[in-house]
């Protein structure tokens, strides 16, 4: 239930996220990693892509047939670049002219917005991929969008703010949907049972996956209350299937320290609820282009030469006895290997900056770069990252950390 990003090495370079078969166990079962890329006005990735008109301009054409043809081309481009779903279109309502995201939304009219939503997602489907309608729901402003409570009557919600989503779902043109950052009447959208289950699945018959927006927050699915981006328990209970995102290679080791495992132990989350999310994710993968692609293991262990034990330069840590390396203030340490073999590198890191900051550190072994550690700021908190597999010989490896400066 954890997606990884941005620019995950398992999928197309420069895209927003990978989800699905991200752990060694899931990959061994033959579950691939699906790919999603930012949109909606074209495909965002490392290489070249086609720029499309913004949503407001498309709706001003009053021509859903033309919009569907345009997005059929977009679907073909997604398919050709091995991207399974575009993170768009945005189908929220133009509630206020100063909303910073109005450019990507269609209009202030629910029916026009819904018609264009069906046309664009239908075109992507015709082209061989899927579109992700967002932001579900009532995402009407950019200022304070992480915490502004959208207080609204049920009648207005259904007749105005949900209609464009409802039309696309009932047309059968979407299999992926993204929730909003904001709470609605006190319940965060990413863990809102009424939205994700009662209305979306039970009333509208939606059978695809639901994902959060990037680094979204959730709160108690019943009581509401305080929000947290680690509350995957209530996300899953609401039937929101995928948390977007944790650091690359962080899904298997729970790098975001979410409450999934502890909630199972406490009896506040059931295996059945997790299985329900897994079923939704696997069903999407079976309907996506990724199921047609060859299953390729991108995490192939690379071999690194050791040096004799008498060439150890720093404090020595034995891989079998210590099972870890602690770097000193000079960012140096020596790793001793008694038995050659394949090992997985897992690191605990802390970066005393906000999430908006980024840092990169090379880990050099005997003068050769062995692994690159990339992270956003963690506000001084410790997180865990699973990095890569390596083949090591008997002997020692003199390790040194090297900060990469922009």
Predicted region positions:
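Glycoside hydrolase catalytic-domain context in secreted enzymes
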Residues: 1-342, 362-370, 376, 391-398
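Extended, low-complexity, turn-rich repeat/linker tracts enriched in Gly/Pro/Ser/Thr and Asp/Glu
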Residues: 79, 350-359
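Contiguous beta-strand segments within globular domains
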Residues: 344-346
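Aromatic- and Gly/Pro-enriched, solvent-exposed loop/edge beta-strand patches characteristic
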Residues: 378-382
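Exposed aromatic-hydrophobic patches
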Residues: 384-390
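Short beta-strand-plus-loop segments that form exposed binding edges in beta-rich domains
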Residues: 400-405
């Amino acid at each position: 239930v954890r997606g990884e990003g941005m620019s995950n090495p398992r999928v197309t370079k420069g895209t927003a996220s990978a989800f699905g078969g991200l752990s060694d166990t899931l990959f061994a079962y033959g579950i691939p990693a699906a790919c999603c890329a930012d949109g909606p006005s074209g495909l965002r990735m490392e290489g070249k892509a086609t720029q499309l008109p913004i949503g407001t301009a498309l709706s001003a054409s009053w021509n859903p047939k033309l919009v569907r043809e345009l997005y059929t081309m977009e679907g073909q481009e997604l398919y050709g670049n091995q991207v399974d779903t575009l993170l768009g279109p945005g189908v929220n309502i133009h509630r206020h002219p100063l909303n910073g995201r109005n450019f990507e939304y269609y209009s202030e009219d629910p029916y026009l917005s819904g018609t264009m939503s069906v046309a664009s997602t239908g075109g992507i489907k015709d082209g061989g991929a899927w579109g992700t309608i967002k932001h579900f729901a009532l995402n009407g402003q950019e200022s304070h969008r992480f915490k502004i409570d959208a207080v609204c009557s049920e009648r207005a919600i259904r007749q105005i703010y949900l209609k464009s989503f409802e039309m696309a779902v009932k047309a059968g043109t979407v299999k992926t949907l993204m929730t909003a950052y904001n709470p609605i009447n006190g319940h965060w959208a990413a863990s809102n049972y009424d939205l994700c289950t009662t209305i979306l699945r039970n009333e509208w018959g939606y059978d695809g996956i639901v994902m959060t927006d990037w680094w979204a927050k959730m709160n108690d699915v019943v009581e509401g209350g305080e929000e947290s981006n680690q509350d995957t328990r209530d996300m899953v209970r609401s039937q929101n299937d995928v948390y977007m995102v944790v650091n690359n290679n962080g899904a298997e080791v729970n790098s975001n320290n979410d409450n999934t495992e502890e909630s199972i132990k406490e009896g506040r989350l059931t295996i059945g609820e997790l299985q329900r999310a897994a079923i939704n994710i696997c069903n999407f993968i079976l309907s996506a282009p990724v199921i047609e692609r060859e299953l390729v293991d991108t995490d192939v262990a690379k071999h690194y030469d050791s040096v004799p034990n008498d060439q150890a330069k720093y404090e020595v840590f034995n891989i079998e006895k210590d099972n870890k390396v602690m770097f000193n203030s000079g960012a140096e340490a020596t790793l001793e290997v008694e038995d050659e073999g394949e090992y997985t590198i897992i690191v605990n890191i802390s970066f005393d900056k906000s999430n908006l900051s980024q840092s990169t550190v090379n880990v050099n072994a005997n003068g050769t770069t062995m692994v690159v550690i990339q992270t956003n700021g963690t506000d001084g908190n410790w997180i865990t990252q699973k990095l890569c597999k390596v083949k090591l010989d008997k002997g020692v490896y003199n390790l040194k950390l090297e900060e990469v400066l922009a």
